[in-house]
Structure formats: structure tokens, C-alpha cells
Regions:
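Feature captures outer-membrane beta-barrel proteins of Gram-negative bacteria and organelles
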Residues: 180-186, 216-224, 275, 279, ...
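Face-selective signature of the C-terminal outer-membrane beta-barrel domain
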Residues: 15-45, 66-209, 225, 289-294, ...
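Outer-membrane beta-barrel signature, preferentially recognizing the C-terminal barrel domain
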Residues: 211, 230, 240-289, 296, ...
Length: 494
């Protein structure tokens, strides 16, 4: 057994993200909407470092490990959308999105007693290119009491990733997802209903490995207007989850001297079953909502960790099941009159509880989580003061818990006509912003925490002014939105 203990790293942790979008919209009311967006997403994270002290169980002799990770990507995308209103209460929507993703990942790992004489030096260089096209079309027809819809969607992608360094290899993968559906919506007095049936085909190919999977995707939505007593809603649906290309790739890369990340081209698409029930009530400024949701994943793709030839292998596999049960209550008042001041106070509070069960091929875990939030805002004429606290819910899946920092913020704002100015503070009671990750595996338990001192007591300044001139154009809304952000590179952040 080897024990690893993190050491505070004084080196900077930098991340640059730039999103540059060019949008064109042409709308003729009740006739058509054409929208074109040219997106350019650039990211660069040059200093993602990690320093650790390590020793064998029962030994006092230690060594050090250091990880330097530099990732960058550039992703241009062209998103075209067209909506046309046809005679006899008909309409059609079409969306086509093409995306290129170029990714570079340079990861260096060293073990040493003397930094100038490393005991191990592992380097992983990944140069990845991905091309994808997403096309979707929906037709709708309205009758007096019923609305009919049908549609198709196709997602085609190809990646070419070159892995250099200590374990060089090249991966070329093709993947597609095709789906079609038919839906009926209607209303009978205070009762509304919607039902749809659909089918999804997922396909994957790498070298001689090729798979195709089919998933039935029904949806049921029911709602009942209780009038003065509130509103009741129910929803059930089955949706497919296809493996990511990064998990499917037939590649293995060493994280360090004992851990290896391995792809799995045998991964299968799995089904997600969701049931949700909610009750909402509102009267004047008072609002309340109670919701319950149950999710069940059949043979989900989750992590597996096992020992092979003295090494720890980290690999995604189709496990037995994952399910979660969530209940959440929200109550609030919006724009209440107080001390004779109209629309002076807005106050919301919410709380929830989630229990999750993760059933792997060789593990079984249960995880409980409480979370809550409180928000208050007072407004007088052009001035407003906002305060918020959130105990953020952690994310649990497989054998990993991703932990989030609680969030506190205060903001003072002044708004007049086109001018908006404000000053605020985030995390006023936090010296170190902390996020973490814990792996509760019996084979290889792991816990890490990342601190960012600069985030504590962070002052925020906000200034905005809206310029208006010339003729005003009311842009039509975009009814379909598709995008691709998966680079297809094997995940080394475990």
C-alpha cells in the first residue's frame, strides 16, 4: 500500500476562457425566424499543478511526486436555425450545427527524492481533433384540442487523437446517434396531457470494433390545475446515455508509477428512467413548490478500479445500477409590501434531501445529502440590496464524491434607466475557497482538496449601460439548441 499526502503548492493556477460569438437574426413576425451563430471558444489552462509526499505503509522513508498539466483547446462552431410558420396552424423547425474541436494536453509526472534526479518521469502528450455535425428537424400541427409533433435528430462525429510521450498510440473513432419521436399534446378542462414514443440508435466504431444499440424512449407528462388549491404535475421518461468517446477509446495511459487509465471500447449505451412529481401553489406574493424525483440508471457507465500485474487499473464499465431519490421544498414571497414600502422585500428559502444508491460489479454504496439555500432582497426606488447563502449539493456517482464549497454573496445595486452599477462581495466568511473529491473504493480509497485563497472575500464590481439607437429589431426565439463540447480524449483527471 502507498500513502499519498498533498503539499501546498505555491505555484499559480491559471485558466483562461474566451467565448467569442457572432450572431445574425432575421425575423418576420408570424412567418419565419432565421438565426445564425458563429461561435469561437478558446481555453488555456497552463498551470494545473499538484505536489504530494508519498511513502509505503509502515515506512518512514518518503519521496515526492509532482504533476504539471497544461491543457488548451480551440473550438469553432457554426449554428444555423430556421423556423417557418405554415398555413393551417403548422410549423417546422430545422437546426444544423457543425463543430470542430482541437485539443492539446501536456501532462508531466515525476517522482523524486532529489528534484534534479527523478526516480520516475512520465509524460503524456495528446493532440486531438474532433469533427461533428448535429442536425435536427421538428414538425408541429395544431388542432382545436390537440397538438401533434414529430421530429428526427442525427449526431455524427469523428475523432483522431494522437497520444505521444511514454506510451504513444493513435486513436481514430467514429460515433453517431440517430433518434426519432412522435408526440401528442392535449387538454381536457383542467387536465393537460402529453405522450410521446421514440427510438434512438447509437453506433460506434474504432478499428475492427463496431457496435450498434437501440433504445426505446417514451415520455409521459400530466398536469392538473387545482385552481385555488395549486397545480399538480407528473413526468415520466426514458432517455438513452451514450458512452463518451474519451471512455470508449482503446487506449491506456499511465497516471503515475502504479495507476493506469484504460479506455473500454466494449461500453454499451444505457437507459435512464426518471419519475418526477411536483406540487406548486401561489397566492398574491406567496409561492411554494414541493417536488419529488426518482432516477434509475440500468447498467450505467461508472468507474471500476482493480489490481492487475501490481498496477491499479482505472476503467469505465457498465455497472449494475445507480438510483437516486430527491425531495425538495421551496417557499418564498416576491415583492412584498413592508413598512408601507411597495415591492420592498423578496425572500426565498429552499431545502432538499437526496439519497443515492450505487451498485457496481464489485461494490455497493449509499450516500445521503442535505442542501439548502436562503435569498433575501430589499428594494427602495432605484437601490437594491441582495444577500444569498447556499449549501451546495455534492455530486455522487459510481465511487466518487465531488465536493463543493458553500456559497455566500452580498450585492448592492443602483439601476436607473439604461445605467446599472453595483458592488458586492463573494465568500465574505471564507478564508480558503475549497473544493474536493473523495473516492470511497475499498481497493484504492482517495481524497483530495483544492484551496484557492484569492477567492475568499472577493470584491465584485459591476457596471453596465445599454446603448439604444436606430430602429429596434425584435429577434425571434430559437426553438432548438444543439452543441458539442466532448473532446473525445481519455480522462486523466481521476
Amino acid at each position: 500500500d502507498r500513502i499519498k499526502e498533498g503539499i501546498e503548492d505555491e505555484s499559480p493556477s491559471l485558466s483562461f476562457i474566451n467565448n467569442l460569438n457572432l450572431t445574425y437574426n432575421l425575423t418576420k413576425a408570424d412567418k419565419y425566424v432565421f438565426n445564425a451563430i458563429f461561435r469561437n471558444n478558446l481555453s488555456n489552462a497552463p498551470y494545473q499543478n499538484e505536489l504530494n509526499k508519498m511513502w509505503a505503509a509502515g515506512s518512514t522513508e518518503s519521496i515526492y511526486s509532482y504533476v504539471n498539466n497544461h491543457t488548451s483547446s480551440y473550438s469553432p462552431a457554426l449554428d444555423l436555425y430556421f423556423q417557418h410558420t405554415l398555413p393551417h396552424q403548422q410549423s417546422i423547425q430545422v437546426n444544423v450545427t457543425g463543430t470542430l474541436i482541437h485539443t492539446k494536453n501536456n501532462r508531466k509526472y515525476k517522482e523524486y527524492k532529489d528534484e534534479n534526479a527523478p526516480l520516475a518521469d512520465i509524460q503524456t502528450l495528446v493532440d486531438g481533433d474532433k469533427r461533428s455535425v448535429i442536425g435536427e428537424a421538428i414538425y408541429e400541427k395544431n388542432f382545436k384540442e390537440v397538438k401533434l409533433s414529430d421530429g428526427v435528430r442525427h449526431y455524427q462525429m469523428r475523432t483522431e487523437n494522437e497520444y505521444k510521450g511514454s506510451n504513444p498510440t493513435t486513436s481514430k473513432m467514429d460515433q453517431s446517434q440517430t433518434s426519432a419521436f412522435f408526440e401528442v399534446q392535449g387538454k381536457v378542462k383542467d387536465f393537460s396531457y402529453a405522450g410521446s414514443v421514440g427510438m434512438t440508435r447509437a453506433w460506434f466504431k474504432e478499428s475492427e470494433e463496431e457496435h450498434a444499440y437501440y433504445t426505446f424512449t417514451p415520455t409521459v407528462r400530466l398536469s392538473y390545475n387545482l385552481k385555488k388549491a395549486g397545480f399538480l404535475r407528473y413526468r415520466f421518461n426514458i432517455s438513452p446515455a451514450i458512452p463518451s468517446l474519451g471512455s470508449l477509446t482503446d487506449v491506456e495511459q499511465a497516471m503515475d508509477t502504479i495507476q493506469i487509465v484504460r479506455g473500454n471500447p466494449l461500453l454499451k449505451t444505457y437507459q435512464q428512467f426518471t419519475n418526477s412529481l411536483s406540487y406548486s401553489y401561489s397566492k398574491k406574493q406567496f409561492n411554494a413548490n414541493l417536488s419529488v424525483r426518482h432516477q434509475y440508471y440500468d447498467n450505467p457507465i461508472m468507474e471500476s478500479i482493480f489490481v492487475e500485474d501490481g498496477k491499479l487499473i482505472l476503467k469505465d464499465e457498465n455497472q449494475r445500477s445507480f438510483q437516486s431519490l430527491n425531495a425538495e421544498l421551496m417557499v418564498g414571497i416576491n415583492g412584498a409590501t413592508l413598512f408601507g414600502l411597495k415591492d420592498f422585500l423578496t425572500l426565498y428559502a429552499s431545502g432538499g434531501y437526496t439519497r443515492s444508491w450505487s451498485e457496481g460489479l464489485n461494490y455497493s454504496h449509499m450516500y445521503d445529502e442535505f442542501y439548502y439555500s436562503v435569498m433575501a432582497q430589499v428594494q427602495y426606488k432605484d437601490f437594491s440590496l441582495l444577500g444569498q447563502f447556499r449549501k451546495v449539493q455534492n455530486n455522487f456517482f459510481g465511487e466518487t464524491i465531488k465536493k463543493n464549497e458553500n456559497q455566500t454573496a452580498f450585492m448592492a445595486m443602483y439601476t436607473r434607466r439604461n445605467l446599472q452599477a453595483g458592488i458586492g462581495i463573494m465568500f465574505p466568511f471564507t478564508n480558503n475557497y475549497k473544493v474536493g473529491k473523495e473516492r470511497i473504493s475499498e481497493v484504492a480509497p482517495f481524497r483530495s482538496e483544492t484551496f484557492v485563497r484569492e477567492t475568499g472575500q472577493m470584491v465584485v464590481l459591476r457596471m453596465g449601460y445599454t446603448f439604444e439607437f436606430g430602429r429596434k429589431h425584435k429577434a425571434g426565439n430559437k426553438g432548438l439548441n444543439n452543441s458539442d463540447t466532448d473532446s473525445g480524449i481519455i480522462n486523466m483527471q481521476r
